[in-house]
């Protein structure tokens, strides 16, 4: 079964319960609101998208390191010197950290100044991104950044906020 919780907090537990009761033969999960220990208790087929859930649970992921490198190269190529770096929650063990490690490594190597903004764990809705972007922009009011590195929805909300603040994309901020 491919799982989607649609923000229902108990849905993930219900899927695991269905697996334990043999209603389904296996679970492919991209939702990760439960503690990893809940997954470790289950000795049935589980595959995870982009999060480590235990030694015996395979993870399907993308080449995050390459993604971080490509993002760094494009921002450097476009002359960015001060970059806002939106990153996922560091408390969660996930392959996506490789993207951020690689991006930060390259930027440091090139002498580019970065401001890291850690996003909350398991928050993927537009309202949260609007809040996070506004919070960041309010905190960095005097810091003139020229580049942004983040997920698609974060980048879109950043573009909206840049425009609201009477700056131009991509002229002033990339």
Residue ranges, per PLM feature:
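Central regulatory/effector-binding core of bacterial HTH transcription factors
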Residues: 1-34
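Bacterial carbohydrate/catabolite-sensing allosteric modules
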Residues: 10-23, 41-48, 53-174
């Amino acid at each position: 079964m491919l799982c989607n919780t649609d923000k229902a907090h108990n849905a993930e537990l219900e899927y695991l319960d269905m697996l334990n009761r043999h209603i389904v033969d296996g679970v492919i999960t991209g939702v990760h609101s439960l503690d990893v220990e809940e997954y470790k208790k289950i000795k049935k087929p589980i595959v995870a998208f982009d999060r480590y859930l235990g030694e015996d649970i395979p993870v399907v992921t993308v080449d995050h390191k390459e993604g971080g490198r490509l993002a760094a190269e494009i921002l450097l190529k476009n002359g960015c010197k001060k970059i806002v770096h939106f990153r996922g929650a560091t408390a969660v063990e996930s392959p996506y950290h490789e993207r951020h490690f690689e991006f930060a490594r390259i930027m440091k190597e090139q002498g580019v100044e970065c401001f890291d903004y850690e996003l909350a764990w398991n928050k993927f809705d537009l309202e949260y991104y609007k809040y996070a972007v506004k919070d960041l922009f309010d905190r960095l009011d005097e810091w003139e950044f020229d580049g942004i590195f983040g997920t698609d929805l974060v980048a879109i909300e950043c573009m909206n906020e840049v425009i609201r603040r009477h700056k131009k994309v991509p002229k002033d901020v990339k």
